[in-house]
């Protein structure tokens, strides 16, 4: 197809000069536009439209299409407009058709254009009748498509007006062409008037179509808003369901994890209980073994101690350790065989003390017992003086009480003080009732008293230097502050030699 390369006004002027049909092909980017463009580029179509056609191709997004749609409404894309000399569309092809059908349409348009040209030479009103045929054919060809039916409505208006004008002048209209029978004077004015009426009607139709488009657009916007809201609601419901499912899955997962943790804890507790039971069993077994070993060791130790005790008892039973306590409070100790008689111990004591106490006897304080001459012949073991015992030397003629008093201490002193009145009464009664004691006994008592006094005095004399030494040593080791004694240190001598102020500061 040979397309015109200029603008629409130039193409219209070229078509008028050559008396050709003006063809406008409105194409888009869709598949039907591509197919229709391929049909126009076919060789048959190019050959059929080589003469009597000026064709121009415009895009739906171009400004030329916008200007063209203001006069000829473009209802469907792609669209092909065949416009005659009077500006009325001879044929409108909506959508895509095959190349053969397009060739057929081109031949029909060429026939209509030629008939219109012959009628215009015979009568000026022939142009109106020639439009009815393409309008009828347009209506016949576009019944299958919704977009083509809208173009048919736009094209029926001029055909109806042409029919009415013909009936008013007494003319007759046919299905394909209409030949006017009016006089030549009226035919010269009618095309101009009809064209004005048609333009007004087309303008009105365009306004109605625009209003319908606006209403349809509003309805479409309302539907879109409803659909949008519906879609939004569905999306919200879907999101809410997803969130609920997610929350449910999370809860199930959490419950499952808790159950697994609980089961794991139970397993661990059971394992711990088993371990404790095993450990307790091992410990009990070990404890029994240890206790058995301890018991065996204890028995062995007890047996050893018994053996040692028996050995020590035997050793002790062979030796008797005797402590001799003198009337002055001093004492000495010696060991004797346990089977030795008590006389041997008395002889050792006599050798040790000499004639200090004269004739003396032996006695024990706990239990209180004074040995007689028969006891001196008995063994120490028989007298229960083995393995150790404490024996008191009693000078002859001295009572045991005095000895106890001299050797016991403050307790016996207090006891003697309490019993002294009774003893005094007893002496008075005994002196009154009985005769004086024999002179031998009196001399013995006097001698014993003298010896005891001498022993006590000598003992006190011996104790005096010892007491002094103890006090001197105590004075060196202790420091007296009032009634309190404290240990001395190396700094005590320096502190005593220093001079101190009243506020506990040392003078320089």
From Swiss-Prot:
Residue stretches of biased makeup (Polar residues): 122-190, 450-459, 498-508
Residue ranges occupied by any UBX domain in the UniProt entry: 315-393
Keywords: Endoplasmic reticulum, Membrane, Nucleus, Phosphoprotein, Unfolded protein response
Interaction with UBQLN1: region residues: 1-200
Biased composition (Basic and acidic residues): 460-491
Protein name per Swiss-Prot or TrEMBL: UBX domain-containing protein 4
Membrane topology (UniProt): Peripheral membrane protein
Main location: endoplasmic reticulum
GO biological process terms held by the UniProt record: ERAD pathway; response to unfolded protein
Lineage per the UniProt record: Eukaryota, Metazoa, Chordata, Craniata, Vertebrata
